[in-house]
Amino acid sequence: MLGIANAVMNVLVQGRRHKPAKALEIGIIDELAATGEEMLDKARAWIAANPEAKQPWEQPGYKIPGGTPSSPKLASILPAFPANLRKQLKGAPMPAPRNILATAVESTQVDVDTAFRIEARYFTELATGQTSKNMTKAFFYDLQAINGGKSRPDGHEKWAPTKVAVLGAGMMGAGIAYVCALAGWEVVLKDVSLEAAEKGKTYSEGLVAKGVKRGKTTLAKGEALLQRITPTADYNDLAGCDIVIEAVFESVQLKQEVFREAMKVVEPDALLCSNTSTLPITELAAGLDRQGDFIGLHFFSPVDKMPLVEIIRGERTSDAALAKRSTSPSGSRRPRSSSTTAAGSSPAA
C-alpha cells in the first residue's frame, strides 16, 4: 500500500505504464523475475512460505501509510488535491482522474467491502458514461474505418510524402515538425529568421531528450529524428517538398503570402495544407492558384500528445488532394474528422 497522497497523485491519475524496475521502486510490485519460469518459481516459493497469507488490510492493527482523510496531517493537504489535479489536466474535463480521487478519499474512510462497492460505483459511472462512449467510438470504430480507407475517395492510390515544408516555427509549427519527423519524413522548418527556426527545432530536441531519459526511445533514434528537421529562413530550401503545412499567425493575408512564396519552389503538385483553426479554408484558397490542392489540416495542441488531426475540405479541394491527405502516415495513425467549409464559414462550424 502506498498511501493516499502517493498512490493518487504519483501513480493512479498519471495514466502511465511503468517498466518493471520503476514499478518495484515505486512500490506497486514486490519482486522482479528475469523470465516467466523464474516468476513461477518465485511465486510457488512465496506461496509455500506463506500458507496463511492475508491482504495487508486484513492484518491486525493495519493503518494506511500517511493516514486517512480524517487524520490531521493528510486533512491539512487534502483540499489541495483537486486544484493540483485540475492543474495537471490543464482544465480538461476528464472524468477518470476525478473519479479516482473521489474513490481514494471515500473508500479509505469505510470498511473494505464498502470500499469495493464505492470503487465499483465510480468505475461503472465511467464505463457507461458519455465520455467513454465517445472515446470508444473515436479510437476504435472511427479509427478502424479510417485505417481501412473508408474516408478516402475512390480511385486514388495510397500516397506518402517524402519531404515536408512547415511554415512557421512557433508552438504549433514546432510540434508539427516533430510529429512529421517522427513519422520518418524529411522536414524543412521555415520561419522569418534562422534564429526563430532553430528555436522551433529546440522543441523537438527537448522531446527527444525526455524520450531518451524515460526509455521511450534511444539516443541513436533521437539523433536520427533531429537530423530529419532542417531549420531555415530561406524559401529556396523548400525545393523538393511535396507537402506544405502552414502554421503562421491567423491572418488571411499572411497565410496567403507565405503560400505564394512557398509555391514558387516546392513541387508543382505539392499538397497545400493550412493548420488554421479559425479561418475558412475556401477563403484562404481563394487568393491562390491551385485551389484544388489546398486543404485544411488542423492539428490540436500540444501536437505531440493530441492524437487528433482535423481534415477540412474547401469548396474547390479536389478528391486527389483529399485522398493524399487521407493516406499519409501521420493521417493514417491519427483519428480525425473530415468536413467541407463554404465561403464565409469557419472550420469549427
Show the residue positions of the predicted features.
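Rossmann-like dinucleotide-binding cores of NAD(P)H-dependent redox enzymes
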Residues: 186-224, 309-322, 344-348
